[in-house]
Amino acid sequence: MILLISDLHLEQERPDITRAFLALLAGRARTAEALYILGDFFEAWIGDDAMSPFQRSICQALRELSDSGTRIFLMHGNRDFMLGKGFCKAAGCTLLSDPSVVQLNGEPVLLMHGDSLCTRDEGYMRMRRYLRHPLTLFILRHLPLSTRHKLARKLRNESRAQTRMKANDIVDVTPDEVPRIMQQFGVRTLVHGHTHRPAIHKLQIGDQSAKRIVLGDWDRQGWVLQVDEQGMNLGSFDFVPETVALLN
């Protein structure tokens, strides 16, 4: 069994999400071969040298899962692209490049966070290229912590405001970009997050059937894609104690 999740946006202000995630780690994830986290794991990340006690507790929980035998793979999102090797080493997880092709049930599957598919949002794509540039990352990592905190708050507030103002199709994936990148990597299955629009989309690429699985965000409920001998099942659960207990 392999589990895939994304867009938890973990932060101390949302203990309900944290409880649900920790229940997943202590339960179903313990029997999984691997856990893939496809970006926006944290609501914000300003550097491995600036871990808060809350973030350290999450790191320790991941380490315990890793030590139990479950492999953990972590991909950058647009909120936590500064996660680095230091965190991954401490958490016992492997940093996964975006995009990456992995074998799931013997089939090559393309994994992405999903923000790079939203090419119609030209302003965001420009900002993404700037923030992910190695020189920008070097500068950001060497800014004082207070400056990084202020910058992170500013970027989050601007992102939320701009998203509310943009048309729905602009902040969703570009339809033509999906088959293009799937053909580029030679896959018939794509799994991504970012858009907060969980669904399984069927599509046609040439003469072959294909599918795009969109993971949900953990805001009002949690979402997990489970891959096993039965196939790929995208499911959700509520953040109530009775439902969270079922994750065990």
From Swiss-Prot:
Question: Which segments does the entry list as coiled coil?
Answer: none
Q: Where does the chain bind substrate?
A: 78-79, 121, 159, 163, 166, 194
Catalysed reaction equations from the record: UDP-2-N,3-O-bis[(3R)-3-hydroxytetradecanoyl]-alpha-D-glucosamine + H2O = 2-N,3-O-bis[(3R)-3-hydroxytetradecanoyl]-alpha-D-glucosaminyl 1-phosphate + UMP + 2 H(+)
Query: What membrane topology term does the record carry?
Result: Peripheral membrane protein
Q: Does the keyword Repeat apply?
A: no
**Does the keyword section mention Cell inner membrane?**
yes
Q: In which pathway does it act?
A: Glycolipid biosynthesis; lipid IV(A) biosynthesis; lipid IV(A) from (3R)-3-hydroxytetradecanoyl-[acyl-carrier-protein] and UDP-N-acetyl-alpha-D-glucosamine: step 4/6
Q: Tell me the compartments it is located in.
A: Cell inner membrane
Secretion signal span: none
Q: What is this protein called?
A: UDP-2,3-diacylglucosamine hydrolase
Q: What is the lineage of its organism?
A: Bacteria, Pseudomonadati, Pseudomonadota, Gammaproteobacteria, Pseudomonadales
